[in-house]
Amino acid sequence: MAAICDLTGLPGLLLPWYGEHRRDLPWRADRQPYHVWLSEIMLQQTRVEAVKGYYIRFLTSLPDIPALARCDDEVLHKLWEGLGYYSRVRNLKKAAQVVMERYGGVFPESYAEVLALPGIGEYTAGAICSIAFNQPTPAVDGNVLRVLARLLDDPSPIDLPETKRRVTQLLSGIYPKEAGDFTQALMELGATVCGPNRAPDCEHCPCKGMCLGFQRDTAASLPVKSPKKARRQEDRTVFILSCDGCFALEKRPETGLLAGLWQFPNVTGRLDTQDALDAVSAMGLHPREILRETEKTHIFTHIQWNMKGIYLEVDACGGSFQWLTEKEINLQAALPTAFRQFWER
């Protein structure tokens, strides 16, 4: 790292603080590997408060690895609906099937074997092995990188692989016997005290006595990230087509963005009224009346959809669509957030 700081005292400061201040979260009720794994996957790119309800609902429906491995894809997508990044849940099922086939349904304990499972990267493997099996395997994510950047007053961009490697190596050398608690304490500190958006709560930090960022008054300016590339903008026109109390849906392709999920019919580009009517006619339908129009935006990691939604009645339920009632859509169809925002009324 760019700065030198003795981290050997970090566990002794963090563990008592964590024991007193840790949040009561549903996935901390036990350390079953399946529960730790599920929570870590759900928490990727998703706020803790949003995950709580999904976690409980998912475990109620799929309480163990065998249930997950044999779950129907439509049911799985419906359980995940609203969490986004649906490749996570598809990989959960694939990994569960590997655990059933290769390990007889018993989650493996070896870091290398866990890392080899579909959808599990270095961070998640480290978290599972540390929390579930009490192994000294660092779980280095954005929270932990932010904490270390401030502790060490280090301006190295935290999104560079070499920065993550150095932090992982540093942490590997100071793990206490309470490995799982130390991993969670680092996560907790980054989530609640040493927070993002230039707003560390240094006065309440158990580590401020050893923190170079606090001592040098640089904590609020850290961490540093590489300049971001501009997100690509894409205009789309989305059709919410209705007929006799039913609505048109179709499946997205099995590969690519939002693979295999339901969507309202849509086309690239921002269509005016006549072009929109022509597009619906080209779908093999006969437009009757445009009910209303609306504007929505959805941001993915590397692309932003700027969407014009057109609510339109047609004469008959035709075309190559599935026509579902409102109840069927609510109970059965997993609509990703990009399209669900046109449905919520």
Regions found by a protein language model. Give the residues of each.
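Catalytic cores of DNA base-excision repair glycosylases
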Residues: 3-203, 207-216, 286
